[in-house]
């Protein structure tokens, strides 16, 4: 018991000393705009996002096995995509370039299956119908696919880390604009269970 108490007090002392140093450094060291933006405002700039990912836990949790499974899953899905659409061609070319996957051949299973697996269902299909420019279609569909990074989705996080074309803010603006352009949302009735306080059990 005495041993554990000694370790506890030692850890508390070390923590207090480290906190003191951190406080001193915070007072004497100027904070760069990059650090301030990424820490407090969570800027969506692609460069800052990549820096945060490389320096954070996201990079540490990506093991070679995870990347292998990620590549295998994407390769499997890409093999099923129909290459008839120019928008799908552009989108697939970006994914292949991003992950270094070589895809040969195709079937008519198409992009909808890939979209369903990533959880965006019919949104990308509706976007493709409304947007005529193939390049914009590719960007919008890609944005819908990698958007789940906001829910800390592992696959979406890795895609976002490697994707040099779109920022999170651009994805949000494009997806929201396209969803709201022709779809008028009906007001939902009040749901008591949504607003009720949640008690976590430990």
From Swiss-Prot:
Superkingdom, natural source: Eukaryota
Subcellular location: Secreted; Host nucleus
Position of the signal peptide: 1-16
Ranges for region Disordered: 29-58
Motif (RxLR-dEER): 49-61
Listed Basic and acidic residues bias regions: 37-48
Keywords of the record: Host nucleus, Secreted, Signal, Virulence
Entry keyword Coiled coil: no
Entry keyword rRNA-binding: no
GO-annotated cellular components: extracellular region; host cell nucleus
Record's comment describing the protein's domains: The RxLR-dEER motif acts to carry the protein into the host cell cytoplasm through binding to cell surface phosphatidylinositol-3-phosphate.
Family, per entry: Belongs to the RxLR effector family.
Function: Secreted effector that completely suppresses the host cell death induced by cell death-inducing proteins.
Protein name listed in UniProt: Secreted RxLR effector protein 93
Naturally occurring in which organism (per UniProt): Plasmopara viticola
